[in-house]
């Protein structure tokens, strides 16, 4: 998140924003609950499950990470319960083999265009050249962490719907998928 994104979201609702420029790591911090015998990751971030496990031993993931917090349950960490990091357009994540994912995204884009919608596509560097579109953005390598900036760019393009490939949930990919799932309201198509 950049200072501009914060201003866009919170202008008039907060008194001040301190902007120290861009950061190297495009993800928020990892939040860990240490109140139980085994540490529980409430929000994955740049410090990965694997890094924590190597340092402290056994670590668990909060069950709500992939399903979201439901009903009247109080979230244990910021950003757990509601659609978060969400673009204006509806976001759908497509998961499966790279070939099937690319083919399904192409079908979904054609469907959207037939309805007169402008469809944005988020792809990894590995799949970026496999689809032709004026409205596609590259997330970088499938282990990169600039998905929030991509979602914001789609807002600037007045995109109606966004289709993103899913990413491996190993290492930093876990945090990326966590943010994408929140932004998509957990809407996934398996292919």
Go through each PLM region and give its residues.
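Active-site-adjacent structural elements in enzyme catalytic cores
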Residues: 1-191
């Amino acid at each position: 998140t950049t200072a501009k994104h914060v201003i866009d979201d919170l202008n008039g609702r907060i008194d001040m924003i301190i902007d120290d420029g861009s950061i190297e790591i495009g993800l928020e911090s990892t939040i860990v609950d240490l109140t139980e015998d085994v540490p529980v990751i409430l929000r994955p971030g740049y410090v990965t499950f694997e890094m924590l496990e190597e340092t402290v031993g056994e670590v668990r993931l909060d069950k709500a990470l992939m399903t979201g917090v439901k009903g009247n349950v109080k979230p244990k960490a910021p950003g757990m319960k509601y659609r978060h990091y969400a673009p204006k357009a509806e976001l759908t994540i497509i998961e499966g083999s790279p070939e099937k994912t690319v083919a399904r995204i192409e079908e979904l884009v054609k469907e959207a265009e037939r309805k007169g919608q402008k469809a944005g596509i988020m792809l990894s560097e590995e799949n970026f050249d496999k689809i032709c579109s004026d409205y596609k953005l590259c997330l970088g390598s499938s282990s990169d962490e600039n998905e929030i900036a991509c979602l914001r760019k789609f807002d600037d393009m007045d995109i109606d719907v966004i289709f993103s490939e899913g990413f491996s949930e190993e290492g930093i990919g876990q945090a990326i998928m966590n943010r994408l799932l929140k932004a998509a309201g957990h809407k996934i198509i398996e292919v």
